[in-house]
């Protein structure tokens, strides 16, 4: 569950990072976090106790992704329940039952998407699911440890013993246990948010420079897995009380005087037990192969306190649980002869190792998890076509064939004509580029050009009509002649030349080039010709007073610098 609002409070210390920054190091992973995310893929099957192993793919994908970036993962799973979390586990069980009933009702009504959401909330990750994942991880050479009780305390202990260099989790109370480097919200590509203990101690905000003791007390006051805390108290309120009363007992006495807070009668005892669970919970030591405390207690604990943080059991059972041979809840060995276990052991190994991974090609690394039918296919592009030469086309000699080719070019895509010089198989290779080349079999042959096409002639006639409608005011401008069907090179050059406009003529009126004039340009020509020697309007607006009304309202002179109502509205 974590501490509600803790990540939001520590947002200034959050840094966006990537797991590749930890290349060459070992990171501990909360395995149950991956399993809880993976149950979304098969929530319906797990809710109705159907055999499935779909949830293994997500966890294995994440572990292989860490290996790809040079990180050595160490997966840690939860063990048996703590007596101090009995009330929390009971509430979670009730919520799961309610979600299952609601999901079953939605499934019967045909609302399958909503039902699957409820089924994913009601699924409880069991030690059998963790055991299957342990076997699958071993096939890929990935190590794992099952904690005697909670994976949070086990991960922090491994970090204190320098067995791991950081922790990947979604549980914010990892910081309350005393973790130094925590990676939150890691996606399937390695992007994550990193919070380091040193950043909290050196925060710019003095109020957030929290030592580990104050951070732990603040979390207990607002509520955690081991106590519900004080009703109506959040993290900021708890921090304010701790800053005013550094001693927890004094802060609790001050809280009782606040009428807006509801402090339980036995909260002092709950606070002490929760503080013990965060500091001295029992964990497994891989070096000594035995159970130890997260941190050695300063005094001898009572029987009730010792049971609250997890009772002690013999070393052989601790080894069997840590290595995944025994169930951490029932303390019994897993029955491999069970039919479900036998079917799993036969099918789990199908998730084969990935070999020959190139670090520069991440797409090949994750491509094996995609079925061949759903893999993207590379489409043929123009670059893929080899030995293709550009075929030069010839202009038509006669006007009739040229008009037909121009008309066909406007109606459909241009088609390369066939020629005897084409290599065999060229049309087949070109079919990937142009579909029209294969559809149109009878393409007319275009002979070499002699003369000018009628298209340019029609264009010149159009320009001539426009020049007649918009006469030029410059005497130096000479219209382009378009009398003959064939234009000489000299006429062709003059038709594309620009005349120097007369300074006395309006703008754009003396240009005699033969480019086609748009409708908007023609409107501009007409407007300038109607007003001789007119210039384009400037941005400066000269105010003209309105005509005086028949009955003036006021004849008082207006002071200099004061705008009239018409001027004000116009501006």
From Swiss-Prot:
A GO molecular-function annotation: 5'-flap endonuclease activity
InterPro entries the UniProt entry points to: 5-3_exonuclease_C_sf (IPR036279), EXO1_H3TH (IPR037315), HhH2 (IPR008918), PIN-like_dom_sf (IPR029060), PIN-like_EXO1 (IPR044752), XPG-I_dom (IPR006086), XPG/Rad2 (IPR006084), XPG_CS (IPR019974)
Chain residues that bind Mg(2+) 1: 30, 78, 150, 152
EC number: 3.1.-.-
Cofactor: Mg(2+)
Gene3D superfamilies reported in the protein's UniProt record: 5' to 3' exonuclease, C-terminal subdomain, 5'-nuclease
Induction: By meiosis.
Residue ranges, annotated region (I-domain): 114-245
UniProt region (N-domain), positions on chain: 1-96
Ranges where the record places region Disordered: 464-489, 530-559
Gene Ontology cellular component annotations, sorted alphabetically: mitotic spindle; nucleus; site of double-strand break
Composition bias type Polar residues, residue spans: 470-489
Subcellular location(s) per record: Nucleus
Co-factor remark: Binds 2 magnesium ions per subunit. They probably participate in the reaction catalyzed by the enzyme. May bind an additional third magnesium ion after substrate binding.
Assigned keywords, A-Z: DNA damage, DNA repair, DNA-binding, Excision nuclease, Exonuclease, Hydrolase, Magnesium, Metal-binding, Nuclease, Nucleus
Function: 5'->3' double-stranded DNA exonuclease that could act in a pathway that corrects mismatched base pairs.
UniProt xrefs under PANTHER family: EXONUCLEASE 1, FLAP ENDONUCLEASE FAMILY MEMBER
Family that this chain belongs to: Belongs to the XPG/RAD2 endonuclease family. EXO1 subfamily.
Quaternary data: Monomer.
Protein name: Exodeoxyribonuclease 1
């Amino acid at each position: 569950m974590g501490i509600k609002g803790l990540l939001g409070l520590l947002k200034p210390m959050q840094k966006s990072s990537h797991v590749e920054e930890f290349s060459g190091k070992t990171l501990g992973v909360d395995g149950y976090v991956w399993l809880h995310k993976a149950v979304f893929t098969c929530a319906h099957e797990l809710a109705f106790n159907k055999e499935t192993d779909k949830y293994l793919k997500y966890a294995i994908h994440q572990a292989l992704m860490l290996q790809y970036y040079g990180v050595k993962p160490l997966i840690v799973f939860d063990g048996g329940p703590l007596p101090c979390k009995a009330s929390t586990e009971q509430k979670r069980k009730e919520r799961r039952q309610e979600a299952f009933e609601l999901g079953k009702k939605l499934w019967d009504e045909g609302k399958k998407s909503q039902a699957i959401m409820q089924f994913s909330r009601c699924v409880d990750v069991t030690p059998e699911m963790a055991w299957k994942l342990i076997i699958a991880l071993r096939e890929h050479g990935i190590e794992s440890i099952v904690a005697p009780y909670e994976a949070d305390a086990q991960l922090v202990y491994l970090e204190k013993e320098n067995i791991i260099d950081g922790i990947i989790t979604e549980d914010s109370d990892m910081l309350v246990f005393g973790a130094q480097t925590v990676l939150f919200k890691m996606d399937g590509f390695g992007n994550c948010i990193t919070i380091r203990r040193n950043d909290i101690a050196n925060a710019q905000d003095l109020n957030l420079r929290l030592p580990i003791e104050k951070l732990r007390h603040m979390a207990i006051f607002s509520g955690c897995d081991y106590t519900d805390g004080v009703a109506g108290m959040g993290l900021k309120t708890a921090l304010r009380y701790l800053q005013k009363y550094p001693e927890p007992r004094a802060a609790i006495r001050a809280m009782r005087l606040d009428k807006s807070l509801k402090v339980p009668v036995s909260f002092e005892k709950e606070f002490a037990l929760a503080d013990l669970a965060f500091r001295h919970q029992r964990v497994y030591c891989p070096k000594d192969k035995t159970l130890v405390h997260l941190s050695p207690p300063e005094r001898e604990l009572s029987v009730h306190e010792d049971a609250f943080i997890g009772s002690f059991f013999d070393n052989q059972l601790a080894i069997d649980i840590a290595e995944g041979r025994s169930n951490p809840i029932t303390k019994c060995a897993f029955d491999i002869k069970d039919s479900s276990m036998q079917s799993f052991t036969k099918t789990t190994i199908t998730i084969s190792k990935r070999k020959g991974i190139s670090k520069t090609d991440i797409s090949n690394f994750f491509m094996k998890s995609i079925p061949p039918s759903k893999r993207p296919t590379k489409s043929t592009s123009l670059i893929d076509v080899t030995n293709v030469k550009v075929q030069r086309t010839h202009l038509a000699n006669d006007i009739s064939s040229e008009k037909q080719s121009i008309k066909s070019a406007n109606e459909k895509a241009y088609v390369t004509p066939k020629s005897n010089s084409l290599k065999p198989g060229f049309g087949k290779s070109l079919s990937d580029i142009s579909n029209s080349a294969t559809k149109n079999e009878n393409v007319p042959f275009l002979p070499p050009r002699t003369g000018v096409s009628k298209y340019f002639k029609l264009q010149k006639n159009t320009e001539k009509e426009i020049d007649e409608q918009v006469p030029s005011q410059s005497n130096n401008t000479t219209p382009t002649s378009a009398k003959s069907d064939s234009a000489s090179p000299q006429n062709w050059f003059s038709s594309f030349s620009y005349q120097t406009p007369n300074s006395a003529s309006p703008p754009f009126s003396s240009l005699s080039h033969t480019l086609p004039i748009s409708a908007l340009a023609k409107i501009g020509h007409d407007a300038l010709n109607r007003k001789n020697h007119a210039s384009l309007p400037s941005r400066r607006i000269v105010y003209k007073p309105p005509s005086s009304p028949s009955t003036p309202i006021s004849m008082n002179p207006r002071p200099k610098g004061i705008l009239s109502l018409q001027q004000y509205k116009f501006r």
